[in-house]
């Protein structure tokens, strides 16, 4: 009975939200919306949405399951093929304070007008941008690991790949929303800068790995007050370059420069571990970090140690964030087309060091 009561409560609350959404839409369009061109539902559409909704509910994605059951046209009316990234309930209910218009924007931002299974996503190069149902807004495949068969979109982990695979609909579960939520902003959705806009391409539109100027990075660090970190990086540079060469899709790096290396000497066996923990395998400006959601992760040269973005207010965006417990105190100190250096407050901790 308790489970039923919980489901009924979810159904009731979302029904009210959808009612307000429908009424509000007739009065005013949100800033980033565009007219929806409906397509005719096939005879299989009702059963498709019902089957997908049941699958979501069984996997405890009850909020999205209810929305898909009550109003499938939100997700399925704009394209014959659809990929939906379902937000887990705990994160989804953090959106309860959003205006219904912006809630609809958020749902459209998590819906793609094409079918992409997990296999399809894993075949995409890191940095690939994908269109969404939200006008002029794209999401980015920020991390791809074919060995572990994991992927992240906008630095948000896909926790339930291929949760539903239908003839025209694919659903993946994600741990949180693809954008920080700003209930009082006229521009709710913050999209990533696509690497496809800034990186070199082959004639087949594939990303070309770049050569990182490590010597220049060491010189910049050394001449601007980060001597211990510069010495540490120089001491293990051969191993760092080897790491770089193993990332065939690497198009840039981010250096999180710490003012000290917790007294590690160049002979310390942990120096290499600490240094590579401070190097991210993509170029991220301060603005890129500020656009990330709470609990988003970023990859380092250490394949077993990701860094996590945390926010004091999960519904905020901007500079109120930390990276695995440290703050960026000197953002965008130095920047080139393939690297950026940020000064951080103190050395990142590594669990096993």
From Swiss-Prot:
The keyword Signal is annotated on this UniProt entry: yes
Domain of life: Eukaryota
Stored InterPro entries: FAS1_dom_sf, FAS1_domain, Fasciclin-like_AGP
Keyword set, alphabetical order: Glycoprotein, Proteoglycan, Repeat, Secreted, Signal
Range of residues in the leader sequence: 1-28
Domain FAS1: 83-181, 254-352
Record SUPFAM superfamilies: FAS1 domain (SSF82153)
Residues with glycosylation annotation: 51, 81, 94, 200, 249, 315
Entry's Gene Ontology cellular component terms: extracellular region
Location in or out of the cell: Secreted
Coiled-coil boundaries: none
PANTHER family: FASCICLIN-LIKE ARABINOGALACTAN PROTEIN 21, OS02G0491300 PROTEIN-RELATED
UniProt record similarity statement: Belongs to the fasciclin-like AGP family.
Cited function: May be a cell surface adhesion protein.
Protein name from the UniProt record: Fasciclin-like arabinogalactan protein 21
Species for this entry: Arabidopsis thaliana (Mouse-ear cress)
């Amino acid at each position: 009975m308790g489970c039923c009561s919980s489901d009924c409560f979810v159904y009731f609350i979302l029904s009210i939200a959808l009612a307000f959404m429908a009424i509000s839409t007739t009065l005013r369009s949100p800033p980033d919306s565009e007219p929806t061109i409906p397509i005719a539902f096939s005879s299989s559409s009702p059963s498709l949405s019902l089957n997908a909704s049941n699958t979501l509910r069984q996997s405890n994605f009850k909020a999205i399951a209810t929305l898909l059951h009550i109003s499938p046209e939100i997700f399925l009316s704009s394209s014959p093929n659809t990929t939906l990234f379902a937000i887990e309930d705990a994160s989804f209910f953090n959106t309860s304070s959003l205006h219904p218009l912006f809630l609809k924007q958020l749902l459209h931002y998590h819906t793609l007008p094409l079918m992409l299974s997990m296999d399809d996503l894993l075949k995409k190069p890191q940095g690939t941008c994908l269109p969404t149902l939200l006008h002029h807004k794209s999401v980015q495949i920020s991390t791809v690991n074919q060995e572990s068969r994991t992927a992240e979109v906008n630095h948000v982990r896909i926790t339930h790949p291929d949760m539903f695979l239908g003839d025209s609909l694919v659903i993946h579960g994600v741990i949180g929303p693809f954008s920080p939520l700003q209930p009082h902003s006229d521009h709710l959705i913050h999209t990533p800068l696509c690497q496809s806009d800034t990186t070199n391409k082959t004639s087949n539109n594939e990303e070309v790995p770049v050569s990182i100027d490590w010597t220049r990075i060491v010189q910049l660090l050394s001449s601007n007050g980060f001597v211990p970190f510069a010495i540490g990086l120089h001491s293990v540079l051969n191993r760092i370059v080897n790491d770089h060469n193993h990332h065939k899709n690497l198009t840039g790096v981010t250096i999180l420069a710490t003012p000290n290396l917790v007294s590690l000497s160049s002979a310390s066996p942990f120096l290499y571990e600490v240094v590579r923990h401070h190097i991210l395998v993509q170029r991220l400006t301060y603005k890129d970090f500020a656009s990330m959601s709470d609990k988003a992760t970023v990859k380092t040269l250490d394949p077993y140690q990701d860094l996590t973005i945390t926010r004091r207010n999960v519904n905020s965006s901007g500079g109120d964030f930390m990276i695995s417990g440290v703050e960026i105190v000197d953002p965008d100190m130095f920047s080139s087309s393939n690297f950026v250096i940020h000064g951080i407050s103190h050395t990142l901790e590594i669990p096993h060091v």
